[in-house]
Amino acid sequence: MKILTHNMMACTKKQCMGKGFPLKVECTEQIVLEQEFNYEFTKNIYPKLDWAGIAEISKKFNIPIQLDTTKHSLEDEEFLKTLHSLLCNLKVITGSLTCPNCQRVYPIDKGIPNMLLREDEIYQDIKE
Amino acid sequence: MSRPEHIAPPEIFYDDVESKKYSSNSRIIEIQTKMAERAYELLAIPETAEGLMLLDIGCGSGISGDVISDAGHHWIGCDISQHMLDVAIDREVEGDVMLRDIGQGFPFRAGTFDGAISISAIQWLCNAEKSHHNPRKRLHTFFQSLFNVLTRGGKAILQFYPENSAQIEMITASALRCGFSGGLLIDFPNSSKAKKYFLVLFTGNNNIMPSAKGVDGAEEYEEEDDNEVKYSNRKRDRRRVTKSKGSAQHKTKDWIMNKKDRQRKQGREIKNDSKFSGRKRGPKF
Protein backbone atom coordinates (compact mmCIF):
# COMPACT_ATOMS: atom_id res chain seq x y z
CA MET A 1 0.00 0.00 0.00
CA LYS A 2 1.44 3.31 -1.06
CA ILE A 3 1.11 6.39 1.09
CA LEU A 4 -0.97 7.92 -1.70
CA THR A 5 -3.60 5.23 -1.17
CA HIS A 6 -3.42 5.70 2.58
CA ASN A 7 -4.07 9.38 2.12
CA MET A 8 -7.26 8.65 0.16
CA MET A 9 -8.59 6.01 2.50
CA ALA A 10 -11.18 6.32 5.21
CA CYS A 11 -13.04 3.97 7.51
CA THR A 12 -16.48 3.24 6.08
CA LYS A 13 -18.41 2.18 9.12
CA LYS A 14 -21.43 4.41 9.31
CA GLN A 15 -20.56 5.98 12.65
CA CYS A 16 -17.22 7.05 11.15
CA MET A 17 -18.78 8.84 8.16
CA GLY A 18 -16.75 12.00 7.55
CA LYS A 19 -14.33 11.43 10.43
CA GLY A 20 -12.81 7.99 9.77
CA PHE A 21 -9.52 9.44 8.47
CA PRO A 22 -6.57 9.71 8.51
CA LEU A 23 -6.13 6.07 9.44
CA LYS A 24 -3.30 5.47 11.86
CA VAL A 25 -0.49 3.43 10.30
CA GLU A 26 1.48 0.75 12.10
CA CYS A 27 4.27 -0.56 9.91
CA THR A 28 6.56 -3.52 10.46
CA GLU A 29 7.88 -3.82 6.91
CA GLN A 30 8.19 -1.24 4.19
CA ILE A 31 9.99 -0.81 0.89
CA VAL A 32 11.13 2.26 -0.97
CA LEU A 33 10.41 2.35 -4.68
CA GLU A 34 12.12 4.51 -7.22
CA GLN A 35 9.53 6.05 -9.44
CA GLU A 36 10.13 8.91 -11.76
CA PHE A 37 8.89 12.30 -10.67
CA ASN A 38 5.60 13.11 -12.38
CA TYR A 39 4.90 16.83 -12.36
CA GLU A 40 1.37 16.66 -13.83
CA PHE A 41 0.24 14.00 -11.42
CA THR A 42 1.59 15.78 -8.35
CA LYS A 43 -0.15 18.96 -9.41
CA ASN A 44 -3.45 17.16 -10.02
CA ILE A 45 -3.38 15.29 -6.78
CA TYR A 46 -2.37 18.29 -4.64
CA PRO A 47 -5.86 19.74 -4.02
CA LYS A 48 -7.21 16.31 -3.05
CA LEU A 49 -4.67 15.59 -0.34
CA ASP A 50 -5.53 15.42 3.30
CA TRP A 51 -2.74 17.29 5.11
CA ALA A 52 -3.49 15.79 8.50
CA GLY A 53 -2.66 12.41 6.92
CA ILE A 54 0.55 13.74 5.35
CA ALA A 55 1.59 15.23 8.68
CA GLU A 56 1.17 11.92 10.41
CA ILE A 57 3.13 9.99 7.79
CA SER A 58 5.87 12.61 7.74
CA LYS A 59 6.28 12.23 11.52
CA LYS A 60 6.02 8.46 11.45
CA PHE A 61 8.62 7.85 8.74
CA ASN A 62 10.76 10.88 9.51
CA ILE A 63 10.41 12.53 6.14
CA PRO A 64 10.53 16.31 6.56
CA ILE A 65 8.03 18.19 4.41
CA GLN A 66 6.56 21.68 4.50
CA LEU A 67 3.22 21.21 6.27
CA ASP A 68 2.05 24.78 6.37
CA THR A 69 -0.35 24.87 3.41
CA THR A 70 -0.23 28.66 3.19
CA LYS A 71 3.45 28.51 2.28
CA HIS A 72 3.06 25.95 -0.52
CA SER A 73 3.77 26.88 -4.06
CA LEU A 74 3.11 24.62 -7.03
CA GLU A 75 6.05 26.28 -8.77
CA ASP A 76 8.47 25.04 -6.12
CA GLU A 77 9.86 21.92 -7.75
CA GLU A 78 11.82 20.86 -4.69
CA PHE A 79 8.64 20.72 -2.62
CA LEU A 80 6.70 18.85 -5.30
CA LYS A 81 9.49 16.31 -5.61
CA THR A 82 9.49 15.61 -1.89
CA LEU A 83 5.73 15.31 -1.96
CA HIS A 84 5.79 12.94 -4.91
CA SER A 85 8.41 10.68 -3.41
CA LEU A 86 6.51 10.60 -0.11
CA LEU A 87 3.28 9.64 -1.87
CA CYS A 88 4.51 7.22 -4.51
CA ASN A 89 7.82 5.77 -3.36
CA LEU A 90 7.05 4.63 0.14
CA LYS A 91 5.15 1.37 0.28
CA VAL A 92 3.90 -0.38 3.40
CA ILE A 93 4.16 -4.17 3.05
CA THR A 94 3.08 -5.46 6.44
CA GLY A 95 1.38 -3.59 9.21
CA SER A 96 -2.04 -2.34 10.09
CA LEU A 97 -4.38 0.62 9.81
CA THR A 98 -6.44 1.87 12.74
CA CYS A 99 -9.51 4.04 12.43
CA PRO A 100 -9.10 7.16 14.62
CA ASN A 101 -12.82 7.17 15.37
CA CYS A 102 -13.93 3.60 16.05
CA GLN A 103 -10.49 2.04 16.65
CA ARG A 104 -11.21 -0.74 14.14
CA VAL A 105 -7.93 -2.34 13.02
CA TYR A 106 -7.46 -3.25 9.36
CA PRO A 107 -4.47 -5.53 8.76
CA ILE A 108 -2.06 -5.05 5.85
CA ASP A 109 -0.43 -8.17 4.47
CA LYS A 110 1.85 -8.50 1.42
CA GLY A 111 1.07 -4.89 0.63
CA ILE A 112 -2.68 -5.52 0.45
CA PRO A 113 -4.84 -3.82 3.07
CA ASN A 114 -7.75 -5.98 4.14
CA MET A 115 -10.72 -3.63 4.28
CA LEU A 116 -13.45 -6.28 4.51
CA LEU A 117 -16.07 -5.60 7.14
CA ARG A 118 -17.51 -8.38 9.23
CA GLU A 119 -21.17 -9.23 9.11
CA ASP A 120 -21.94 -7.63 12.49
CA GLU A 121 -20.25 -4.41 11.39
CA ILE A 122 -22.47 -4.13 8.35
CA TYR A 123 -25.47 -4.93 10.45
CA GLN A 124 -24.46 -2.12 12.77
CA ASP A 125 -24.53 0.17 9.77
CA ILE A 126 -28.01 -0.82 8.80
CA LYS A 127 -29.36 -0.31 12.29
CA GLU A 128 -28.07 3.23 12.65
CA MET B 1 -22.71 -19.89 -21.37
CA SER B 2 -21.70 -20.89 -17.89
CA ARG B 3 -21.99 -18.17 -15.31
CA PRO B 4 -19.32 -18.22 -12.60
CA GLU B 5 -21.62 -16.38 -10.21
CA HIS B 6 -23.88 -19.45 -10.18
CA ILE B 7 -21.01 -21.68 -9.09
CA ALA B 8 -19.63 -20.01 -5.99
CA PRO B 9 -19.20 -16.59 -4.34
CA PRO B 10 -16.39 -14.51 -5.94
CA GLU B 11 -13.94 -14.86 -3.06
CA ILE B 12 -14.25 -18.64 -3.34
CA PHE B 13 -14.66 -19.03 -7.11
CA TYR B 14 -11.48 -17.06 -7.85
CA ASP B 15 -9.24 -19.43 -5.92
CA ASP B 16 -5.62 -20.26 -6.51
CA VAL B 17 -6.24 -22.17 -9.75
CA GLU B 18 -8.81 -19.83 -11.25
CA SER B 19 -6.66 -16.78 -10.44
CA LYS B 20 -3.56 -18.23 -12.06
CA LYS B 21 -5.53 -18.48 -15.32
CA TYR B 22 -5.75 -14.72 -15.28
CA SER B 23 -1.99 -14.36 -15.40
CA SER B 24 -1.29 -17.15 -17.89
CA ASN B 25 -4.24 -17.58 -20.26
CA SER B 26 -3.54 -15.30 -23.20
CA ARG B 27 -7.13 -15.45 -24.40
CA ILE B 28 -8.52 -14.22 -21.08
CA ILE B 29 -5.90 -11.49 -20.96
CA GLU B 30 -6.72 -10.40 -24.50
CA ILE B 31 -10.47 -10.19 -23.89
CA GLN B 32 -10.02 -8.36 -20.59
CA THR B 33 -7.56 -5.92 -22.11
CA LYS B 34 -9.92 -5.21 -25.04
CA MET B 35 -12.82 -4.50 -22.74
CA ALA B 36 -10.68 -2.33 -20.48
CA GLU B 37 -9.45 -0.38 -23.49
CA ARG B 38 -13.00 0.19 -24.63
CA ALA B 39 -14.04 1.23 -21.13
CA TYR B 40 -11.13 3.65 -20.98
CA GLU B 41 -12.13 5.03 -24.37
CA LEU B 42 -15.67 5.60 -23.09
CA LEU B 43 -14.30 7.58 -20.14
CA ALA B 44 -13.34 10.10 -22.83
CA ILE B 45 -10.40 11.54 -20.93
CA PRO B 46 -8.89 14.30 -23.05
CA GLU B 47 -5.53 13.28 -24.50
CA THR B 48 -3.77 16.21 -22.88
CA ALA B 49 -4.85 15.17 -19.40
CA GLU B 50 -2.19 13.24 -17.55
CA GLY B 51 -1.73 11.83 -14.09
CA LEU B 52 -5.36 11.47 -13.09
CA MET B 53 -6.57 9.26 -10.27
CA LEU B 54 -8.82 6.39 -11.36
CA LEU B 55 -10.63 3.64 -9.51
CA ASP B 56 -10.71 0.06 -10.78
CA ILE B 57 -13.69 -1.80 -9.36
CA GLY B 58 -13.15 -5.53 -9.17
CA CYS B 59 -9.58 -5.10 -10.39
CA GLY B 60 -8.69 -8.79 -10.05
CA SER B 61 -5.17 -9.43 -11.28
CA GLY B 62 -4.82 -5.89 -12.56
CA ILE B 63 -5.21 -6.51 -16.30
CA SER B 64 -7.58 -3.57 -16.63
CA GLY B 65 -5.29 -1.53 -14.40
CA ASP B 66 -2.44 -2.02 -16.85
CA VAL B 67 -4.51 -0.25 -19.50
CA ILE B 68 -4.84 2.72 -17.14
CA SER B 69 -1.13 2.68 -16.31
CA ASP B 70 -0.29 2.62 -20.01
CA ALA B 71 -2.42 5.71 -20.50
CA GLY B 72 -0.32 7.47 -17.86
CA HIS B 73 -2.73 7.61 -14.95
CA HIS B 74 -2.70 6.32 -11.41
CA TRP B 75 -5.20 3.78 -10.16
CA ILE B 76 -6.37 2.07 -7.01
CA GLY B 77 -8.18 -1.24 -7.29
CA CYS B 78 -10.63 -3.09 -5.07
CA ASP B 79 -11.38 -6.79 -5.23
CA ILE B 80 -12.87 -9.38 -2.94
CA SER B 81 -10.62 -12.27 -3.95
CA GLN B 82 -7.36 -12.53 -2.01
CA HIS B 83 -5.89 -14.91 -4.59
CA MET B 84 -6.55 -12.54 -7.47
CA LEU B 85 -4.84 -9.73 -5.56
CA ASP B 86 -1.89 -12.00 -4.84
CA VAL B 87 -1.57 -12.53 -8.59
CA ALA B 88 -1.72 -8.77 -9.07
CA ILE B 89 1.11 -8.30 -6.55
CA ASP B 90 3.14 -11.03 -8.27
CA ARG B 91 2.66 -9.29 -11.60
CA GLU B 92 3.96 -6.09 -9.96
CA VAL B 93 1.14 -3.90 -11.19
CA GLU B 94 1.70 -0.18 -10.90
CA GLY B 95 -1.46 0.66 -9.05
CA ASP B 96 -2.37 -0.17 -5.49
CA VAL B 97 -4.83 -2.93 -4.68
CA MET B 98 -6.91 -3.64 -1.61
CA LEU B 99 -9.23 -6.33 -0.37
CA ARG B 100 -12.76 -5.05 -0.20
CA ASP B 101 -16.30 -6.19 -0.90
CA ILE B 102 -17.70 -3.55 -3.27
CA GLY B 103 -21.17 -4.28 -1.91
CA GLN B 104 -19.98 -2.62 1.29
CA GLY B 105 -19.04 0.59 -0.48
CA PHE B 106 -15.56 2.06 -0.93
CA PRO B 107 -13.19 2.95 1.90
CA PHE B 108 -12.16 6.31 0.46
CA ARG B 109 -12.67 9.95 1.25
CA ALA B 110 -15.27 11.78 -0.81
CA GLY B 111 -14.26 13.25 -4.18
CA THR B 112 -11.04 11.29 -4.55
CA PHE B 113 -11.30 9.82 -8.04
CA ASP B 114 -11.55 11.45 -11.45
CA GLY B 115 -13.13 8.36 -12.93
CA ALA B 116 -13.86 4.70 -12.41
CA ILE B 117 -13.88 1.62 -14.57
CA SER B 118 -15.08 -1.87 -13.84
CA ILE B 119 -14.73 -4.96 -16.01
CA SER B 120 -17.13 -7.86 -15.46
CA ALA B 121 -17.67 -7.26 -11.79
CA ILE B 122 -20.98 -5.73 -10.85
CA GLN B 123 -23.15 -8.65 -11.95
CA TRP B 124 -21.77 -10.41 -8.88
CA LEU B 125 -23.68 -7.92 -6.74
CA CYS B 126 -26.98 -9.26 -8.04
CA ASN B 127 -26.58 -12.51 -6.14
CA ALA B 128 -27.07 -13.00 -2.43
CA GLU B 129 -24.07 -15.04 -1.33
CA LYS B 130 -24.60 -14.87 2.39
CA SER B 131 -27.69 -14.96 4.54
CA HIS B 132 -27.39 -11.27 5.39
CA HIS B 133 -26.96 -10.18 1.77
CA ASN B 134 -29.67 -8.21 0.08
CA PRO B 135 -28.78 -7.52 -3.58
CA ARG B 136 -30.84 -4.34 -3.83
CA LYS B 137 -29.34 -2.90 -0.68
CA ARG B 138 -25.82 -3.88 -1.73
CA LEU B 139 -26.25 -2.28 -5.16
CA HIS B 140 -27.57 0.85 -3.48
CA THR B 141 -24.61 1.02 -1.08
CA PHE B 142 -22.25 0.42 -4.00
CA PHE B 143 -23.62 3.19 -6.23
CA GLN B 144 -24.04 5.64 -3.38
CA SER B 145 -20.46 5.12 -2.30
CA LEU B 146 -19.25 5.31 -5.91
CA PHE B 147 -21.06 8.62 -6.34
CA ASN B 148 -19.35 9.95 -3.22
CA VAL B 149 -15.80 8.97 -4.10
CA LEU B 150 -15.99 10.45 -7.63
CA THR B 151 -15.27 14.12 -8.21
CA ARG B 152 -18.06 16.24 -9.65
CA GLY B 153 -17.91 15.80 -13.40
CA GLY B 154 -16.40 12.36 -12.93
CA LYS B 155 -17.43 9.38 -14.98
CA ALA B 156 -17.80 5.69 -14.29
CA ILE B 157 -17.82 3.03 -17.01
CA LEU B 158 -18.99 -0.32 -15.73
CA GLN B 159 -18.89 -3.30 -18.06
CA PHE B 160 -20.97 -6.23 -16.89
CA TYR B 161 -22.66 -9.43 -18.01
CA PRO B 162 -26.34 -9.21 -17.12
CA GLU B 163 -28.18 -12.47 -16.80
CA ASN B 164 -31.57 -11.14 -17.87
CA SER B 165 -33.39 -7.89 -18.43
CA ALA B 166 -34.56 -7.78 -14.81
CA GLN B 167 -30.92 -7.54 -13.69
CA ILE B 168 -30.22 -4.73 -16.15
CA GLU B 169 -33.19 -2.88 -14.85
CA MET B 170 -32.25 -3.44 -11.21
CA ILE B 171 -28.69 -2.18 -11.76
CA THR B 172 -29.59 0.84 -13.90
CA ALA B 173 -32.46 1.90 -11.65
CA SER B 174 -30.25 1.65 -8.60
CA ALA B 175 -27.55 3.80 -10.23
CA LEU B 176 -29.99 6.50 -11.31
CA ARG B 177 -31.56 6.58 -7.86
CA CYS B 178 -28.17 7.37 -6.35
CA GLY B 179 -27.85 10.59 -8.35
CA PHE B 180 -26.02 9.43 -11.44
CA SER B 181 -27.08 10.42 -14.92
CA GLY B 182 -26.31 8.36 -17.98
CA GLY B 183 -27.48 4.97 -19.10
CA LEU B 184 -26.75 1.68 -20.71
CA LEU B 185 -24.63 1.39 -23.84
CA ILE B 186 -24.59 -1.82 -25.83
CA ASP B 187 -21.75 -2.56 -28.25
CA PHE B 188 -22.59 -4.93 -31.11
CA PRO B 189 -26.23 -5.41 -30.09
CA ASN B 190 -26.89 -7.78 -32.99
CA SER B 191 -24.11 -10.22 -32.21
CA SER B 192 -24.52 -12.78 -29.49
CA LYS B 193 -20.78 -13.09 -28.93
CA ALA B 194 -19.37 -9.62 -29.34
CA LYS B 195 -22.31 -8.01 -27.52
CA LYS B 196 -21.06 -6.04 -24.52
CA TYR B 197 -22.99 -4.07 -21.94
CA PHE B 198 -21.50 -0.87 -20.55
CA LEU B 199 -23.17 1.20 -17.89
CA VAL B 200 -22.08 4.78 -18.55
CA LEU B 201 -22.56 7.00 -15.51
CA PHE B 202 -21.91 10.71 -14.96
CA THR B 203 -21.93 12.56 -11.67
CA GLY B 204 -22.72 15.83 -13.45
CA ASN B 205 -25.66 16.48 -15.70
CA ASN B 206 -24.35 18.06 -18.86
CA ASN B 207 -22.88 15.06 -20.55
CA ILE B 208 -23.49 13.45 -23.88
CA MET B 209 -23.87 9.71 -24.05
CA PRO B 210 -21.14 8.21 -26.22
CA SER B 211 -22.35 6.15 -29.15
CA ALA B 212 -22.20 2.37 -29.26
CA LYS B 213 -20.03 0.41 -31.62
CA GLY B 214 -21.35 -1.89 -34.33
CA VAL B 215 -25.00 -0.88 -34.12
CA ASP B 216 -25.65 -1.29 -37.84
CA GLY B 217 -23.95 -4.67 -37.81
CA ALA B 218 -21.54 -3.80 -40.62
CA GLU B 219 -18.57 -2.92 -38.45
CA GLU B 220 -18.94 -6.05 -36.48
CA TYR B 221 -16.59 -8.11 -38.58
CA GLU B 222 -13.65 -5.99 -37.58
CA GLU B 223 -13.92 -7.34 -34.06
CA GLU B 224 -11.56 -10.02 -32.90
CA ASP B 225 -14.46 -12.03 -31.51
CA ASP B 226 -15.87 -12.50 -34.95
CA ASN B 227 -12.61 -13.67 -36.38
CA GLU B 228 -12.97 -16.47 -33.98
CA VAL B 229 -16.41 -17.26 -35.31
CA LYS B 230 -14.98 -17.48 -38.82
CA TYR B 231 -12.29 -19.80 -37.56
CA SER B 232 -14.75 -22.08 -35.81
CA ASN B 233 -16.83 -22.14 -38.97
CA ARG B 234 -13.82 -23.37 -40.87
CA LYS B 235 -13.34 -26.03 -38.26
CA ARG B 236 -16.92 -27.11 -38.55
CA ASP B 237 -16.61 -27.29 -42.34
CA ARG B 238 -13.56 -29.48 -41.99
CA ARG B 239 -15.45 -31.73 -39.66
CA ARG B 240 -18.25 -31.99 -42.19
CA VAL B 241 -15.80 -33.04 -44.88
CA THR B 242 -14.30 -35.83 -42.80
CA LYS B 243 -17.77 -36.98 -41.94
CA SER B 244 -18.78 -37.22 -45.60
CA LYS B 245 -15.55 -39.12 -46.25
CA GLY B 246 -16.67 -41.54 -43.57
CA SER B 247 -19.97 -42.02 -45.30
CA ALA B 248 -18.12 -42.86 -48.53
CA GLN B 249 -16.60 -45.85 -46.82
CA HIS B 250 -20.05 -46.59 -45.57
CA LYS B 251 -21.55 -49.92 -46.81
CA THR B 252 -18.32 -51.35 -48.16
CA LYS B 253 -17.68 -55.03 -47.40
CA ASP B 254 -15.37 -54.24 -44.46
CA TRP B 255 -17.89 -51.90 -42.96
CA ILE B 256 -20.70 -54.46 -43.22
CA MET B 257 -18.57 -57.22 -41.69
CA ASN B 258 -17.55 -54.95 -38.85
CA LYS B 259 -21.11 -53.97 -38.18
CA LYS B 260 -22.29 -57.59 -38.19
CA ASP B 261 -19.52 -58.51 -35.72
CA ARG B 262 -20.45 -55.63 -33.45
CA GLN B 263 -24.10 -56.56 -33.45
CA ARG B 264 -23.33 -60.22 -32.88
CA LYS B 265 -21.35 -59.22 -29.81
CA GLN B 266 -24.37 -57.28 -28.64
CA GLY B 267 -26.30 -60.54 -28.82
CA ARG B 268 -28.58 -59.60 -31.68
CA GLU B 269 -29.88 -62.04 -34.25
CA ILE B 270 -27.62 -61.67 -37.30
CA LYS B 271 -27.69 -63.51 -40.61
CA ASN B 272 -24.72 -65.80 -41.21
CA ASP B 273 -21.90 -64.54 -43.40
CA SER B 274 -21.91 -65.95 -46.90
CA LYS B 275 -20.15 -65.27 -50.21
CA PHE B 276 -22.94 -62.81 -51.02
CA SER B 277 -22.42 -60.67 -47.89
CA GLY B 278 -21.45 -57.15 -48.81
CA ARG B 279 -21.06 -58.07 -52.46
CA LYS B 280 -21.79 -55.45 -55.10
CA ARG B 281 -25.03 -56.00 -56.92
CA GLY B 282 -24.94 -56.29 -60.66
CA PRO B 283 -26.08 -53.50 -62.97
CA LYS B 284 -29.79 -52.87 -63.00
CA PHE B 285 -31.71 -52.98 -66.20
Question: For each predicted feature, which ranges?
Answer:
Chain B
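Conserved beta-strand signature within the Rossmann-like core of class I S-adenosyl-L-methionine
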Residues: 153-160
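A short beta-strand submotif of the Rossmann-like class I SAM-dependent methyltransferase core
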Residues: 118-121
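A short acidic, Gly/Pro-enriched loop at the edge of an enzyme's catalytic core
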Residues: 103-116
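A short glycine-rich, Lys/Arg-flanked "PGG" loop and its adjoining helix->strand segment in the class I
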Residues: 134-152
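Conserved S-adenosyl-L-methionine
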Residues: 180-191
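Conserved class I S-adenosyl-L-methionine
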Residues: 1-49
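C-terminal lobe and adjacent flexible extensions of AdoMet/dcAdoMet transferase-like proteins
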Residues: 195-285
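Class I SAM-dependent methyltransferase SAM/SAH-binding core
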Residues: 53-105
